[in-house]
Amino acid sequence: INKHKKIKSTKNFFVTKNLKEIFLKTNTFIIIVLNEKQCEKIVNKFIEIKKNIKINKNHTIINCATVSPNWVEKIYKKLKKNNFEYIDCPVSGGPKKAISGNLSLILSSKKNIYKKNFALLKDIGNNIYNLGNKIGTGSTVKIINNCLAGIQILSAAEAIMLAKKEKINLKKIFKIINNSSGQSWMFADRGKRMIEKKYIKPLSRLSIFKKDMKLANN
C-alpha cells in the first residue's frame, strides 16, 4: 500500500488495516506484495485468525506476487493443513495494465478451484494462462519470463551505448531495431525511454529487478 496515498472505502470495496475484518467478510484473498517474507507474514496471520475464530470452511488464497516455486510448494503444504486452497498466480504487465485490468495471469491451481474463481481472475487480467494443477508451475514460468525481460533490458542498454559510442543517430537505431530481428518489447518500451532520457516517472524499482534476477539465478 502506498502510505502517501489515502484510499477510501466505497460501495464496491472497503479499506481496512484489520486482517480479521477481511477474513470475516470474504472467503477469497488476493495477495500482491513485494516478496516471500511479506507473503508469509500475511499467510501466517490468516492461519492464526482462522484458528482463533475456529472456522472450518475452506478459504482460497490467490497469490499474485513473484516468488520462488520452492517457496510456493512449502507454503501450499502449510495452507493445505489449515483448510486453505491456493492459486499460484503471478502477474505480468506493470502498473498500466493493473489499472486497466489487462494483466497477464500465469497460474497453476486445482481445476475446481480455478473454475470457482475464474470470474474474479477475469476481473484482474484478460490474458489468463492456466498451466495445470501442479502448484508452483505458474511461479516457475513467471521467473523464466522475468529472466528474459531482465536480459533484454541489459542488452537494450548495451546496444544503445554501442550506437552512441559509434556516433550513430539513436532515433534511427531505435527505428531500425524495432523493424528488424533485434526487436523486443523491452527494447521498444524501455529502450525508447533510455534514448529519450525520460526518467521522471519510474516504471519499476531496481530492487524488484534484482530480486527477480536472483530468483532466476537460484
Segments predicted by a language model, with ranges:
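Conserved SAM-binding strand-loop segment of SAM-dependent methyltransferases
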Residues: N12-N18
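NAD(P)-binding Rossmann-fold cofactor-contacting core
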Residues: I1-K11
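Rossmann-fold dinucleotide-binding core
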Residues: T66-N146
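Interdomain hinge/lid region at the active-site interface
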Residues: S139, L148, W185-N218
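Rossmann-like NAD(P)(H) cofactor-binding subdomain of soluble oxidoreductases
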Residues: L19-L24, T28-I31, N35-L103
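Active-site-proximal catalytic alpha-helix in oxidoreductases
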Residues: S100-L107, Y129, I135-E166, I176-D189
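Beta-strand segments within the central parallel beta-sheet cores of soluble alpha/beta enzyme folds
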Residues: L120, K171-N179
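Amphipathic alpha-helical segments within well-ordered protein domains
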Residues: A157-M161, F174, I195, K214-N217
